[in-house]
Amino acid sequence: MRQENDSLGIVLVPEDKLFGAQTGRSQEFFSYGKESMPLEIIHALVKIKKCAAKANGDLGCLDAKRRDMIVAATDEILSGEFDEHFPLKVWQTGSGTQSNMNVNEVIANLAIQRHGGELGSKHPVHPNDHVNKSQSSNDVFPTAMHIAAVQSIKGSLIPALEHLKKVIDAKALEFARDIKIGRTHLMDAVPMTLGQEFSGYSCQLHNCLERIGFSLTHLYELAIGGTAIGTGLNVPEGFVEKVIQYLRRETGEPFVPASNYFAALSNHDALVQAHGSLTVLACALVKIATDLSFLGSGPRCGLGEIFFPENEPGSSIMPGKINPTQSEALQMVCSQVIGNNQSIIFSGTKGNFELNVMKPVIIYDFLQSVNLLAGAMRSFADYFVCGLKVNKGQLQQNVERSLMLVTALAPVLGYDKCSKIALKAFHENLSLKEACVSLGFLSEKEFDEHVIPGLMVGNRGHE
């Protein structure tokens, strides 16, 4: 162990770790839970420190030697080699101060170590005076939240969603001529094609992509420069413009200064809104997964209209059983996302006066949702949707037995007579044709001329 110190005194930290006193105190007083601060946030904080050092250097607020030491240390950390030096949990102060200081301490000590100095000496690089210069945890942490959210959405979620949509589009084309019975209220309705049904799924996902894309607009606004409460105390003139410019280069994202720093620190409406769009996606995915599970139910005593890919045995007691495992896993992910949304909504209400104090749990839940959805969508696409096959015989049988084909006769016979045909066929276990002819409404030839399932599906969804 070695001694580190802060304003409250001496703290013992492991000799082989680069963090300092404030991180050590946080480990002692917030030792519960297994939910570590996401590395996406840690790396976003490191990027901010790198860009802040450059901006401070440009403005003459930080000498070139210290600037270069800080930048070099951040580059090493961003390689992933030092991830073990960021041990703190999400459960800490609601501003994320402990994690901000964890990053400051590791950068400072790594810079000192690389130049032959003594760990914990805070010389020549001080975690507060130099690494945290022109910053506050209150503006740095929300900035990191937005950076991590944008990069995770664009880097993993959107590509996974686009991939799933592409796979569903391919299935819509493959199933374009497979006529099936539609269902409303879980009951038989008029015919459609399986391709049309899949086109509806595709449209849902397309709309989700648009909503998620729109939600990025406000996530591009960064709080950096607001410092403690939004007034910008201790921020040199020109710092905001320069640090944003460097962050744009570092991330490749079109970040801009917050339109109002008091709002940027005291609320997280942009993240609440963005996660809302993820919740809509979760709702759409549950609908799609549930539909496909029902369509393949059976295989002999359910609907059995599609065949699932045979990925693994489905039961430890019933031999030969194949279950929609990917569908169920996806629905559990969506359940978690919907639960996260409730957590984020409540946490979003805790903007007490000038500072929201539930920042860590907001971004933890947000990133968990993004990562789970991205992984689950790819797995669902590759190991489930890609392998779906049509049970053509079952589709045809269900179409031929459906009573709702009588809807095609409504323009000819009227609603009341058609109702009599359907009810007679149901109660007497007759075909629609048999019931219609026995009632004397049409001949067999006339019935066949009007009831043609292939002409009842229209062209929608096949454009």
Curated annotation (Swiss-Prot):
Function: Involved in the TCA cycle. Catalyzes the stereospecific interconversion of fumarate to L-malate.
Location relative to the cell: Cytoplasm
Enzyme class at the top of the EC tree: lyase
Family (UniProt): Belongs to the class-II fumarase/aspartase family. Fumarase subfamily.
Species of the source: Chlamydia trachomatis serovar D (strain ATCC VR-885 / DSM 19411 / UW-3/Cx)
GO molecular function, one term: fumarate hydratase activity
Site entry: Important for catalytic activity: E328
Protein name, per record: Fumarate hydratase class II
InterPro entries: Fum_hydII, Fumarase/histidase_N, Fumarase_C_C, Fumarate_lyase_CS, Fumarate_lyase_fam, Fumarate_lyase_N, L-Aspartase-like
